[in-house]
Design a protein with these regions (language model features):
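Extracellular-loop-to-transmembrane junctions of the mid-late helices
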Residues: 34-42, 164-229, 313-319
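Juxtamembrane membrane-interface segments at transmembrane-helix boundaries in membrane proteins
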Residues: 15-38, 65-76, 101-113, 151-163, ...
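Class A (rhodopsin-like) GPCR signature focused on the TM5-ICL3 interface and adjacent 7TM helical core
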Residues: 208-243, 282, 325-330
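Helix-to-loop junction signature of class
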Residues: 2, 11, 84-101, 175-194, ...
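Extracellular/lumenal N-termini and interhelical loops of multi-pass eukaryotic membrane proteins
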Residues: 1-27, 88
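The cytoplasmic-loop to transmembrane-helix boundary for the fourth helix
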Residues: 137-184
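Intracellular effector-coupling site of seven-transmembrane GPCRs
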Residues: 155-157, 161-164, 172, 233-291
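Seventh transmembrane helix
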Residues: 278, 314-348
Length: 349
């Protein structure tokens, strides 16, 4: 079995189907360079995600990674991002060196691993948002019968039990459908069965499209609500703190403490907004792209301009977005720990 078998030809020509192979095809040099950049950027954000995760685990030894049956949101995001980065590294090395060129089950599985881990990372974070919302000040669920007509924040949030059920159901279903169809697509590519190859490729892409659409809805409604309530909660706590501190501290110490608190909050909100906006932008694009690819993947891959753009966004742009989010998280962690250290020193003085 060789690479130029009929199953890999589109309209009788050998185009690079870049999620599976980038060698011995049209414009292969472009895709090889793209995957070299993917390898470098994925290595950087994998190390960064792993470093931040270790730092948080050391700083928060009391943290329960499986609280209320759901993986801790930020730690889950970092962990799945690290796993996704490892999958991107393995995939890049495989395609650049052309390892196991006709073992398509392996190639489909490692290509799929990049995307399923990315989705699991943001699903985990969104589950944490759902779990936190009911405990925040100003939150008034629309399901309540005792709310006034002037309530601004009226929205229904599932119970903790339902959140846990939905989280594991969506995650496990996504893994089974995408990984199963990836394996079957690879198998039928090896068996030279184009019809079933297209069927299972479409099933996997439709599953990703639906999952991305759910995430876009979740982050556009509940993610933004979470940010707004966090800002209102900070204003409430800040106001109460100033009343107490008026009788306990000098004006200078109060101003210093308020400045540190404002700085920590500024970076915390920046982290939340960056995460939410990145998720919305990325998964809106991939929701539309997944549905289009599900039914017209051969047409996209055989149109070099569209194929190159998609490969660039899927690899380089996506990695840069993840890297930006991780840098913002790292800055937020540094500011948070610095503020706590300063407060500890002031208490000792």
């Amino acid at each position: 079995m060789n690479r130029s078998q009929p199953i890999n030809l589109i309209n009788g020509k050998m185009y690079c189907q870049w999620p599976i192979f980038i060698s011995e095809c049209y414009e292969s040099q472009y895709f090889i360079i793209t995957y070299y950049v993917n390898l470098v950027t994925a290595t950087i954000f994998t190390l960064l995600a792993g470093g931040i995760l270790i730092m948080r685990l050391i700083a928060h030894r009391e943290l329960n990674l499986l609280s209320n049956g759901i993986i801790a949101p930020l730690e889950g995001f970092l962990g799945f991002s690290m796993l996704g980065g490892i999958a991107r590294i393995v995939c890049s090395v495989t395609l650049i060196i052309d390892v196991l060129p006709t073992y398509y089950i392996y190639r489909e599985m490692i290509s799929d691993a990049q995307w399923v881990t990315a989705q699991l990372s943001v699903i985990t974070y969104l589950a944490g948002v759902f779990r936190t919302l009911p405990h925040m000040p100003f939150f008034q669920p629309s399901c309540s019968n005792h709310q006034s007509s002037t309530t601004n924040m009226t929205i229904c949030v599932p119970t903790s039990y339902l959140i846990r059920i939905l989280y594991w159901t969506i995650s496990i279903t996504l893994i089974i459908i995408t990984s199963g169809s990836a394996m079957l697509a690879g198998y039928f590519r090896m068996k030279d069965n184009r019809f079933l190859l297209n069927v299972f490729t479409s099933i996997r892409l439709v599953a990703y499209g639906i999952s991305c659409a759910i995430l876009v809805i979740g982050y556009s409604i509940y993610g933004r609500l979470f940010i707004n309530l966090t800002m209102q909660s900070f204003d409430l706590v800040q106001g109460q703190g100033e009343i107490i501190e008026e009788f306990q501290e000098t004006h200078i110490i109060r101003d210093e403490r308020e400045e540190r608190r404002n700085l920590r909050f500024k970076y915390h909100i920046r982290k939340m907004k960056m995460f939410n906006n990145s998720a919305l932008m990325t998964f809106t694009f991939w929701s539309l792209t997944s549905f289009i690819l599900a039914f017209w993947h051969d047409q996209i891959w055989s149109t070099l301009f569209l194929s190159k753009i998609q490969a660039f966004i899927a690899n380089i742009s996506t990695n840069l977005i993840i890297l930006t989010v991780l840098i913002v998280i790292l800055l937020s962690e540094f500011v948070h720990h610095k503020g706590l250290d300063d407060e500890t020193r002031n208490q000792l003085i």
